[in-house]
């Protein structure tokens, strides 16, 4: 029997999964992952530390971290067939569509596709973590009729990722900030894309299928696509006054403004956004160009005063990525690439303690219709 009193649109506040992976503690402004505060970790630990923590359960020592990096480097290359498939896509395709295709095609190269054992899924997770940055970067190059960029083994994981996107080796500061962004995007409890992945995994579908669904979810502007929309607004506005006018115009038309508000954080600033704001300040100080920072701060003030809304991570990640020389269409694919580790952890957990998701509906359509003789 369906209990209509339990209907909550959008499942807001509904507990849909039990997990040991992460939890958003909004009271203490902590993102708890495996018992640690992700925000605190991001100040001293890098993305590979988070990868090891989420997949192995511990923060790695130096030997473990080096072994992890070598493992991922061995997985950088993607099959030639995937490059060929990507080259067949229309040049108008969005990189998220190319990424969705690439992840899906990867499944066909897995000779143990039906195996759901933890050790096999863990191996798949490392393969995906190694290959997805390659697919992200080179799908963009291919769609723009550019030659694929080969990974460099002498660079760190994050530095190589950024290099494959921009074609130039990042500075120490650029590498640090890009790596920190990957950390902040790595895991965030049960957003739409993670829920999608767990729902798919609950059918005992494979890891690739679950992640392919997550790509589709993350593409939406109400989820991952917001960072691209933010940068496009900043580009359109060009100046501080222009951005103020743009925001006031959107507010008067009751249009949704991307980069502000969060279903969980509600009436406070996303703590990850504050860290990306500091990163934007650091990058702006390098050449003395703080226009984007001024624009963002002006927008932040307007939205706080007029709507009581605060920036989320996407709001400040967008200008940071622009400063790093990253093309706008790659902002969301990078989001997905960094979230791959969290998604893999959730799919593995779902496989190991599974109950298929099968909710009901509150039907509001017609009843008792008859076909006349």
From Swiss-Prot:
Its EC number is 2.3.3.16. Keywords: Allosteric enzyme, Transferase, Tricarboxylic acid cycle. The keyword Repeat does not apply. InterPro entries: Citrate_synth-like_lrg_a-sub, Citrate_synth-like_sm_a-sub, Citrate_synthase, Citrate_synthase_AS, Citrate_synthase_bac-typ, Citrate_synthase_sf. The active site is at residues 262, 314. GO terms for cellular component: cytosol. It catalyses: oxaloacetate + acetyl-CoA + H2O = citrate + CoA + H(+). Pathway: Carbohydrate metabolism; tricarboxylic acid cycle; isocitrate from oxaloacetate: step 1/2. GO terms for biological process: carbohydrate metabolic process; tricarboxylic acid cycle. One of its GO terms (molecular function) is citrate (Si)-synthase activity. Homohexamer. Citrate synthase is found in nearly all cells capable of oxidative metabolism. Belongs to the citrate synthase family. This is Citrate synthase. It comes from Heyndrickxia coagulans (Weizmannia coagulans).
């Amino acid at each position: 029997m369906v209990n209509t009193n339990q209907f909550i649109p959008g499942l807001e506040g509904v507990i849909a999964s039990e997990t040991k992976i992460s939890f958003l503690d909004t009271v203490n402004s902590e993102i708890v992952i495996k018992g640690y505060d992700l925000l605190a970790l991001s100040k001293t630990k890098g993305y590979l530390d988070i990868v090891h923590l989420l997949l192995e359960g511990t923060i790695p020592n130096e030997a473990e971290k080096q072994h992890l990096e070598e493992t991922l480097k061995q997985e950088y290359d993607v099959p030639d067939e995937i490059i060929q498939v990507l080259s067949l896509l229309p040049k108008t395709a969005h990189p998220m569509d190319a990424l969705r295709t690439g992840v899906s095609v990867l499944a066909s190269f897995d000779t143990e596709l039906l195996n759901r054992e933890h050790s096999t899924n863990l191996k798949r997770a490392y393969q995906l973590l190694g290959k997805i940055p390659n697919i992200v970067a080179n799908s963009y190059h291919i769609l723009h009729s550019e030659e694929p960029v080969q990974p460099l083994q002498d660079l760190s994981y994050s530095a190589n990722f950024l290099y494959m996107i921009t074609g130039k080796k990042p500075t120490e500061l650029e590498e640090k900030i890009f790596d920190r962004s990957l950390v902040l995007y790595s895991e965030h409890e049960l957003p739409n894309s993670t829920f999608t992945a767990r729902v798919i995994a609950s059918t005992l579908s494979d890891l690739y299928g679950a992640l392919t669904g997550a790509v589709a979810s993350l593409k939406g502007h109400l989820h991952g696509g917001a960072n691209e929309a933010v940068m496009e607004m900043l580009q359109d506005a060009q100046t501080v006054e222009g951005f103020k006018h743009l925001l006031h115009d959107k507010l008067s038309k009751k249009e949704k403004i991307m980069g502000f508000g969060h279903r969980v954080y509600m009436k406070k600033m996303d703590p990850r956004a504050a860290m990306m704001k500091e990163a934007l300040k650091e990058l702006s100080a390098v050449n003395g160009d703080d226009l984007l920072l001024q624009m963002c701060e002006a927008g932040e003030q307007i939205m706080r005063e007029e709507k009581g809304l605060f920036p989320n991570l996407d709001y400040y990640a967008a200008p940071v990525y622009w400063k790093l020389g990253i093309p706008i269409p790659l902002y969301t694919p990078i989001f997905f690439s960094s979230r791959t580790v969290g998604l893999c952890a959730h799919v593995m957990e779902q496989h190991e303690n599974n109950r298929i998701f099968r909710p009901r509906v509150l039907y509001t359509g017609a009843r008792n219709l008859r076909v006349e003789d």
